[in-house]
């Protein structure tokens, strides 16, 4: 059962608009064939031409060649894995670290159900979800910054 709002044809303002032809697709330019055959291919081919042109005119180096016999002193993951890397690095029990990593998406899945009875969309009128979001963001930033530091300074961020 779909929820659609049917127009009120007894409304005189709507009837006047319909009498003028407004509210229907009787004005403007049709999408077929004008947009689909002429404008879209030009935009797509122009995007491809710009991408290929930039790749040919300004080839960027990938970086220094890899040396399989030299490993870096500390292997760091990509920046978006820093918070969970910090969890794995600081928790002594690795099983607990993996469970804490699995708790991150599980916790994110529970946030919408904490205030599902609240009908407001304004964050200031949803204090529980907003508080959880702000605390989670602060913890993720704290863990992310700590992952880039040596392990003895990672939890305090070198401030103490």
Curated annotation (Swiss-Prot):
Instruction: Read off the SUPFAM superfamilies from this record.
Output: a domain/subunit of cytochrome bc1 complex (Ubiquinol-cytochrome c reductase)
Of the GO CC terms on this record, one is: mitochondrion
Localization, UniProt: Plastid, Chloroplast thylakoid membrane
Q: What is its main location?
A: plastid
> Biological process (GO) annotations?
mitochondrial electron transport, ubiquinol to cytochrome c; photosynthetic electron transport chain
Q: Specify the protein's topology with respect to the membrane.
A: Multi-pass membrane protein
Which Pfam families did the record assign? Cytochrom_B_C (PF00032)
For molecular function, the Gene Ontology terms on record are: electron transporter, transferring electrons within cytochrome b6/f complex of photosystem II activity; electron transporter, transferring electrons within the cyclic electron transport pathway of photosynthesis activity; ubiquinol-cytochrome-c reductase activity
What keywords were assigned to this record?
Chloroplast, Electron transport, Membrane, Photosynthesis, Plastid, Thylakoid, Transmembrane, Transmembrane helix, Transport
Q: Which parts of the chain span the membrane according to its record?
A: 36-56, 95-115, 131-151
Q: Which PROSITE patterns match?
A: CYTB_CTER
Tell me, what does this protein do in biology? Answer: Component of the cytochrome b6-f complex, which mediates electron transfer between photosystem II (PSII) and photosystem I (PSI), cyclic electron flow around PSI, and state transitions.
Quaternary state and partners of this protein?
The 4 large subunits of the cytochrome b6-f complex are cytochrome b6, subunit IV (17 kDa polypeptide, petD), cytochrome f and the Rieske protein, while the 4 small subunits are petG, petL, petM and petN. The complex functions as a dimer.
* Protein family: Belongs to the cytochrome b family. PetD subfamily.
Q: Which PANTHER family match?
A: CYTOCHROME B (PTHR19271), CYTOCHROME B_B6 C-TERMINAL REGION PROFILE DOMAIN-CONTAINING PROTEIN (PTHR19271:SF41)
Name listed for the protein in its UniProt record: Cytochrome b6-f complex subunit 4
Instruction: Give the organism the record lists.
Output: Anthoceros angustus (Hornwort)
Q: Which gene encodes it?
A: petD
């Amino acid at each position: 059962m779909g929820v659609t709002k049917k127009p009120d044809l007894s409304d005189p303002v709507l009837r006047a608009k319909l009498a003028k032809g407004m509210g229907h697709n009787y004005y403007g330019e049709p999408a077929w064939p004008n947009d689909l055959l002429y404008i879209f291919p030009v935009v797509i081919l122009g995007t491809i031409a710009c991408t290929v042109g930039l790749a040919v005119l300004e080839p960027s180096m990938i970086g220094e060649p890899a040396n399989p016999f030299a490993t870096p002193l500390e292997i760091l993951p990509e920046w978006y894995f820093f918070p969970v890397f910090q969890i794995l690095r600081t928790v002594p029990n690795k099983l607990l670290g993996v469970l804490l990593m699995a708790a991150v998406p599980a916790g994110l899945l529970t946030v919408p159900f904490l205030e599902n009875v609240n009908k407001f969309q304004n964050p200031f009128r949803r204090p529980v979800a907003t508080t959880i979001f702000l605390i989670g963001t602060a913890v993720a930033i704290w863990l992310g910054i700590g992952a880039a530091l040596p392990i003895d300074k990672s939890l305090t961020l070198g401030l103490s």
